[in-house]
A protein has these predicted regions:
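Alpha-helical transmembrane segments and their helix-helix packing motifs
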Residues: 1-178
Length: 178
């Protein structure tokens, strides 16, 4: 059996067991994963704005670099992130290690609580001093404007590409953990 299959099967068993054992703990881990990524997104936005005053060309890199730290938090603190669950659980369902209906239930539950965790932390950041002073030149405003200016197809393909990078990073972490 390949190392990938071993990791997928182990991850599926662990996620399914946690989900069956305690929905509350699973929800909390999912909320924390959403919060970790919101935290790194917020810090990345401020970092991008700060660096843009001196070296504007680096602002997108700074944001991406700081955002990646949120993924590290998810991995280190065992958060339940919908993106990685899509990889593990879908692969597990494909290989028959988890039922398709159970996979969909866990994914919906995880995605919902990722969103709840992100919303709660985003609300707190919205109340902070740093986010009260965003202007139309701010990284956040220009990033959202750029995203809204793209076609649906471009956003779809960029989303898939971003998820591929996240899953490669998570799989790499899992394989290096041995």
């Amino acid at each position: 059996m390949s190392q990938f299959k071993e990791k997928v099967f182990a991850a599926c068993a662990k996620k399914e067991a946690l989900f069956d054992e305690s929905l509350g703990r699973y929800a909390l881990r999912s909320m924390l994963a959403g919060a970790y990524l919101t935290m790194s997104t917020a810090v990345g936005i401020i970092g991008a704005d700060v660096i843009a005053t001196g070296i504007p060309a680096l602002s997108r890199f700074v944001f991406a670099f700081i955002f990646a730290i949120g993924l590290v938090f998810v991995l280190i603190f065992n958060g339940e992130l919908a993106t990685s669950n899509m990889m593990f659980l879908t692969s597990g369902a494909y290989y028959g290690k988890i039922k398709w209906s159970k996979m969909c239930t866990i994914l919906l539950y995880c995605t919902f609580f990722n969103f709840v965790g992100a919303l709660i932390l985003a609300w707190f950041f919205n109340q902070s001093f740093s986010f009260q002073h965003l202007t139309d030149k701010s990284f956040l405003v220009t990033a959202v404007s750029t995203k809204l200016g793209k076609t649906d197809w471009m956003n779809f393909t960029e989303g898939i590409t971003a998820n591929m990078f996240v899953n490669i990073a998570i799989l790499g972490y899992m394989l290096l953990k041995e």
